[in-house]
């Protein structure tokens, strides 16, 4: 499946559901209590993170999308902590605060990255469903996707009012379902149960064929647009009306904590769909995101750079021949990791030992080496009729195979100046015996604070001489 990073900055999403505070107490454990056979934790650090629907909104904002959140809290310190964390993350949160009930808090006691105990502070909310629906309907005009993040805690009382209000505006509705009655999600565009939740409704599935059959029957019964079953180490299965099932393998390299993985899936789906991605691509991105988040400890969000790196790995674009858009994403990610970008360019028609030595020297000037390659038409203009000997695709493929080269990109102009303005390398390198000011593009690079370096050429190594020698034979 071909994946690319969506324009998340053009993706407004509204999340409605059960918000909660995930609270962590971290400490050291070195002895057993004399009062009971339990470890004693000396608490050294307190940490609060948004949980439930708030974590969904946080994930959406972390991807660079616009996140709006409607939920229910108490009027207490936990609600204030939630509000402050969400505001700092760029989430537009609108809470229905209830004086007589506490904000839901999940307290986890941690030691050496292990969870020793969880304590829940919660009561089912008695929500003013009509007032909440009014808040939601007033925000629908501002968003492209509605997410119902349902943990069965009482914030969502009348799902159908919200689903029908969104459908009337042609806004897709995504629901992360809970409980034993999925009929409350009737008419949703997509629901995302995990395997356990799915089998609670349809019964145990002996194999994938049975899962698909039961899933399709459930979709028909509830008038669902699509169904995504998340299956842990077995990946995900997407079902759509009239389309074959799409099975995606799990992408996690290491699993440390599955807390909040479902939130990550639905948030990435929602943001991608709001950005204009088709559903299969959005699911592919969500699968990658889930593989990242389970490698983190506790409730966590993933960032756009993290997802971008995963996409690049998936598409094989960590190295090799890239289009300009892919290259710019790769550069952005490299810079986020403090890497110095080096650029050089040429025709590289017949690769020889001089080229290899020069490119190794160029790579040594920084952390990542980009090679800009003249396309065929520009080589002909520069070198004359009969050149290039090798097409641009073949020239780039050979360069990409060198260990010194990270990324190869072509350009159509006679000089790389336009490409340099977009790439903005930290170091521009050319080989020759002329001064820095004579290097094409030097003024562009120096204008934004970059460096220009001239490296010596390997003697008796010239493509033109090699071509002429071959012709004389």
Curated annotation (Swiss-Prot):
Please give the biological process terms from Gene Ontology that the record holds. Answer: ADP-L-glycero-beta-D-manno-heptose biosynthetic process
Which CDD domains does the record match to this protein? Answer: RfaE_like
Keyword Nucleotide-binding in annotation:
yes
Q: Relate the protein's function as given in its record.
A: Catalyzes the ADP transfer from ATP to D-glycero-beta-D-manno-heptose 1-phosphate, yielding ADP-D-glycero-beta-D-manno-heptose.
**What's the protein here called?**
Bifunctional protein HldE
Q: Which residues bind ATP?
A: 194-197
Q: Region Ribokinase: list its residue ranges.
A: 1-317
Q: Where is this region: Cytidylyltransferase?
A: 343-473
Q: Name one GO molecular function term.
A: ATP binding
- Annotated keywords: ATP-binding, Carbohydrate metabolism, Kinase, Multifunctional enzyme, Nucleotide-binding, Nucleotidyltransferase, Transferase
Outline the subunit composition.
Homodimer.
What is its pathway? Answer: Nucleotide-sugar biosynthesis; ADP-L-glycero-beta-D-manno-heptose biosynthesis; ADP-L-glycero-beta-D-manno-heptose from D-glycero-beta-D-manno-heptose 7-phosphate: step 1/4; Nucleotide-sugar biosynthesis; ADP-L-glycero-beta-D-manno-heptose biosynthesis; ADP-L-glycero-beta-D-manno-heptose from D-glycero-beta-D-manno-heptose 7-phosphate: step 3/4
Q: Which GO terms describe its cellular component?
A: cytosol
What gene name does this entry carry? hldE
* Pfam families, per database record: CTP_transf_like, PfkB
Q: Which Gene3D superfamilies does the record cross-reference, listed alphabetically?
A: 3.40.1190.20, HUPs
Q: List the disulfide bonds.
A: none
Write out the similarity annotation: In the N-terminal section; belongs to the carbohydrate kinase PfkB family. In the C-terminal section; belongs to the cytidylyltransferase family.
Q: What is its EC number?
A: 2.7.1.167, 2.7.7.70
């Amino acid at each position: 499946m071909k994946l690319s990073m969506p324009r998340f900055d053009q993706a407004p999403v509204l999340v409605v559901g059960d918000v909660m505070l995930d609270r962590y107490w971290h400490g050291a454990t070195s002895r057993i209590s004399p009062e009971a056979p339990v470890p004693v934790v000396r608490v050294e650090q307190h940490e609060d993170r948004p949980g439930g629907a708030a974590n969904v909104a946080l994930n959406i904002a972390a991807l660079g999308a616009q996140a709006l959140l409607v939920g229910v809290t108490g009027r207490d310190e936990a609600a204030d902590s939630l509000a402050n964390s969400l505001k700092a993350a760029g989430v537009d949160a609108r809470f229905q605060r209830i004086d007589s009930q506490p904000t839901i808090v999940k307290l986890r006691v941690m030691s050496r990255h292990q969870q020793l105990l969880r304590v829940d502070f919660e009561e089912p909310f008695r929500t003013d469903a009509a007032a909440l629906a009014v808040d939601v309907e007033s925000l629908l005009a501002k968003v492209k996707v509605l997410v119902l993040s349902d943990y069965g805690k009482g914030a969502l009382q009348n799902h159908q009012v919200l689903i029908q209000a969104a459908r009337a505006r042609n806004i897709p509705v995504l629901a992360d379902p809970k409980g034993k009655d999925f009929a409350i999600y009737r008419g949703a565009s997509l629901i995302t149960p995990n395997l356990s939740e799915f089998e609670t409704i349809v019964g145990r599935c002996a194999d994938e064929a049975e899962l698909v059959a039961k899933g399709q029957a459930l979709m028909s019964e509830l008038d669902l647009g699509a169904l995504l079953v998340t299956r842990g180490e077995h990946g995900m299965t997407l079902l759509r009306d009239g389309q074959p099932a799409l099975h995606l393998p799990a992408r996690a390299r290491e699993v440390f904590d599955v807390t909040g993985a479902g939130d990550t899936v639905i948030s990435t789906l929602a943001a991608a769909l709001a950005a204009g991605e088709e559903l299969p691509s959005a699911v592919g991105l969500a699968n990658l995101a889930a593989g990242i988040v389970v490698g983190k400890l506790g409730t966590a969000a993933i960032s756009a750079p993290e997802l971008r790196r995963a996409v690049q790995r998936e598409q094989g674009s960590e190295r090799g021949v890239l289009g300009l858009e892919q290259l710019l994403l790769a550069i952005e990610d490299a810079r986020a990791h403090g890497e110095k970008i080096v650029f050089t360019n040429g025709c590289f028609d017949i690769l020889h030992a001089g080229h290899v030595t020069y490119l190794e020297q160029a790579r040594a000037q920084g952390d990542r080496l980009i090679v800009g390659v003249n396309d065929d038409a520009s080589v002909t203009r520069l070198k004359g009729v009969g050149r290039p000997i090798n097409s641009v695709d073949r020239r780039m493929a050979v360069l990409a195979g060198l260990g010194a080269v990270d990324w190869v990109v072509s350009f159509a102009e006679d000089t790389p100046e336009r490409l340099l303005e977009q790439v903005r390398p930290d170091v521009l390198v050319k080989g020759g015996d002329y001064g820095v000011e004579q290097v094409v593009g030097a003024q562009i690079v120096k204008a934004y604070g970059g460096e220009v370096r001239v490296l010596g050429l390997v003697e008796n190594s010239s493509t033109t001489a090699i071509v002429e020698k071959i012709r004389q034979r």
